[in-house]
């Protein structure tokens, strides 16, 4: 497909009378390339974009995006550097062709110039500005991956620049759409012929404006959505950079982008699926409602089913929905199918393997979980330290404690990302079992612990939750009493036993020993207590006080930022119900 030039548009010269149509044909070509990528044609998509890289700024961006995606899925240094170089090349191409702005002005002055000729330069100018902002966002992401202070600062300022471009383009395109509609519905006055706005609108089509609105709405919506989840302790920095954070605006913009004919429409669809099936449950954005967002996600999959019949990514999200609905066997089937569909896409296979490992842990099938995590430990470049910890925990939970201890000893050696909270947690937890042989009971407890921290307990069936409760009660170790009570509280909460959950959370919050060995237990227990008390009108005030206490009275514990996002979401939902 990629090799057949006849089916794609040739490069238009400026003097070509059909040049005004070129941007839309570029958009169709770029959209076809992205759709190809999502239907498991990663190589074909890469070849297509490379073949037409010099065809237009849009195709150059498509090639750079595929390069960026490849870098983010592998985390290989050389691929990340190549992606940076490609994105900068695309950015320079767009900036160099900004002569279109001057050309527009010249066309306005020259009365004998065909009015249509000003149109592509204006449409192109907006397109190039959006591409520049997109490139800057991806460059910032590549910078953040380095996890160095200077990289964070640099990335922050790059994002600030990108946001200003998105914001201006969004306003400009909305204004043009309004002007276009006005032009269609009103009889133009003679004086309008001399009006700049009339000249700008001349020749602009509804289709081109709609596509441009879709193009800018992807980045504009992502900014709003991501910033809306930032906890208060980071909001000062965010506000300093001038970023907004309106969740509803973000979702609305991404939905518009997903239904547009822009090349990023499929990416906006994936972003919405990611938000509804991963972000919302993980950060508890819907409070105790563990199925929030599932109806929206299912509706998206239903609408897009015919366009992506064999997409490993869409099959992956189908599995996510099934997992959140506690249909673990169905979820496992979907993840295994996605794994097979992604035969040439190692990174997508790894994402599927990760979910298979988690679903197996949810089912307390530690042998299958061990197989998945061990393969990830050996194959993935993302976080071998974390995968080694999960491998050891599951191996010990099967009863092979000697083999588990050998893997626990590997965790420290694989610790590379010093500022990564997940790796810090993995090393800290593995340290104890590196020095002394773990017991099967403690490894099972450790597996329940990660299920709790990753918000996976609500995905467990009642029989499995009861088995987990029994496993916690069987642990007789004074150093993990606080942790045991926290987990028992979470299990009883999922079982609907609110009073039992309340008592266990209170015990966990009071446990002094866990402040040294499991420092996150008291603030998390405090948060859980607060959330439980929010469910009753009589105890809402006490619940809010506990949430604020969890936020303000503790610091320096594992997954602090993660908890702050959840507290922020709980307080925000409370403000919606009871305005302060």
Curated annotation (Swiss-Prot):
Q: Which domain of life is it from?
A: Eukaryota
Repeat TPR: residue ranges?
Answer: 312-345, 350-383, 482-515
- What does the UniProt keyword field contain? Repeat, TPR repeat
Q: Coiled-coil annotation: which residues?
A: none
Check the UniProt entry and state the signal peptide residues, or none: none
Q: Which Pfam families match?
A: Iml2-TPR_39
Keyword field contains Lipid metabolism: no
In the record, the note on similarity to other proteins reads: Belongs to the TTC39 family.
Q: What is this protein called?
A: Tetratricopeptide repeat protein 39C
Q: Which organism is it from?
A: Mus musculus
């Amino acid at each position: 497909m990629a090799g057949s030039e006849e089916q794609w548009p040739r490069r238009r010269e400026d003097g070509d009378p059909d040049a005004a149509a070129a941007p839309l044909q570029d958009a169709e070509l770029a959209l076809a390339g992205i759709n190809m990528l999502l239907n498991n044609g990663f190589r074909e998509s890469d070849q297509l974009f490379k073949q037409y890289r010099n065809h237009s700024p849009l195709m150059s961006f498509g090639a750079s995006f595929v390069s960026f995606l490849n870098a983010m899925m592998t985390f290989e240094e050389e691929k990340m550097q190549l992606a940076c170089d490609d994105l900068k090349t695309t950015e320079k191409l767009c900036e160099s062709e900004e002569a279109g702005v001057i050309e527009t002005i010249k066309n306005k002055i020259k009365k004998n110039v065909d009015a249509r000729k000003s149109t592509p330069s204006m449409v192109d100018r907006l397109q190039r500005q959006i591409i520049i902002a997109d490139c800057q966002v991806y460059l910032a992401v590549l910078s953040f991956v380095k996890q160095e202070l200077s990289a964070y600062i640099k990335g922050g300022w790059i994002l600030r620049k990108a946001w200003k471009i998105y914001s201006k383009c969004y306003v400009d395109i909305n204004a043009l759409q309004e002007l276009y509609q006005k032009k269609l519905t009103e009889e133009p006055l003679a004086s309008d012929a001399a009006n700049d706005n009339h000249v700008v609108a001349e020749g602009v089509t509804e289709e081109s404006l709609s596509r441009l609105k879709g193009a800018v709405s992807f980045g504009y919506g992502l900014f709003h959505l991501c910033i809306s989840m930032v906890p208060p302790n980071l909001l000062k920095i965010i506000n300093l950079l001038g970023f907004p954070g309106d969740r509803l605006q973000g979702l609305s913009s991404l939905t518009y982008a997903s239904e547009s004919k822009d090349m990023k429409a499929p990416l906006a669809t994936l972003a919405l699926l990611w938000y509804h099936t991963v972000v919302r449950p993980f950060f508890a954005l819907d409070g105790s409602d563990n199925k929030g967002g599932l109806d929206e996600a299912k509706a998206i999959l239903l609408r897009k089913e015919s366009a992506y019949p064999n997409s490993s990514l869409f099959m992956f999200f189908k599995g996510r929905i099934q997992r959140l609905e506690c249909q673990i066997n169905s979820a496992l089937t979907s993840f295994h199918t996605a794994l097979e569909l992604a035969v040439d896409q190692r990174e997508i296979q790894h994402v599927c393997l990760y979910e298979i490992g988690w679903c197996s842990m949810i089912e307390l099938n530690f042998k299958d979980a061990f197989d998945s995590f061990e393969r990830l430990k050996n194959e993935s470049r993302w976080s071998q330290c974390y995968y080694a910890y999960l491998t050891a925990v599951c191996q010990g939970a099967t009863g092979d404690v000697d083999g588990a201890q050998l893997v626990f000893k590997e965790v420290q050696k694989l610790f590379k990302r010093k500022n990564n909270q997940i790796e810090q947690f993995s090393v800290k937890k593995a340290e104890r079992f590196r020095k002394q042989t773990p017991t099967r009971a403690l490894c099972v407890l450790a597996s329940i612990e990660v299920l709790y921290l990753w918000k996976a307990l609500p995905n467990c069936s009642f029989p499995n939750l009861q088995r987990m409760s029994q496993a916690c009660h069987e642990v007789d170790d004074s150093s993990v009493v606080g942790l045991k009570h926290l987990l028992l509280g979470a299990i009883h909460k999922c079982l609907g036993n609110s009073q039992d959950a309340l008592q266990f959370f209170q015990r966990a919050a009071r446990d002094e020993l866990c402040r040294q060995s499991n420092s996150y237990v008291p603030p998390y227990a405090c948060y859980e207590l607060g959330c439980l008390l929010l469910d009753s009108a009589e105890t809402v005030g006490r619940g809010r006080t506990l949430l604020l206490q969890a936020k303000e009275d503790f610091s320096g514990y594992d997954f602090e930022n993660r908890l702050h996002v959840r507290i922020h979401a709980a307080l925000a939902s409370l403000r919606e119900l009871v305005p302060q």
